[in-house]
């Protein structure tokens, strides 16, 4: 498991990179497509997850999940595309999907981009913008439409969160914590 998010109904979604670095050479890491997202639910309100289903399967190292109404937005490794999935019959397995944002292969550092040197995060902030790490874009999801806009600065690939006022905090390989003291809406683009 590499990432956990909750939807508005308390269901937990867990991204699993099942092929990540299974040996010292990384054999199959980006080719096996055995990543998945599990959905866990508490059926009786006791705070313990009673049911787990494989919500989406056969993914290429899923690295971002964001609940949107009754959809779950997902981005995989080596692509900038965002695909939304939903379960329409209540069995806990996604049976419908749609492309929210199509931008094609991830190529920030060339075609052989490292698994670590790619975006993650997908954090919905209080300014109604969706922030990700490492890439200089942020997104907005309104009326079923996913829009991207450039933002200044360089993030990190490891973690992103915000406080109650919308200040962004992130970490990287050399410093334990960084923060944006001014909200990104005040940054020049």
PLM-predicted stretches and their roles:
Residues 1-189:
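Beta-propeller domains with acidic blade repeats across secreted/periplasmic ectodomains
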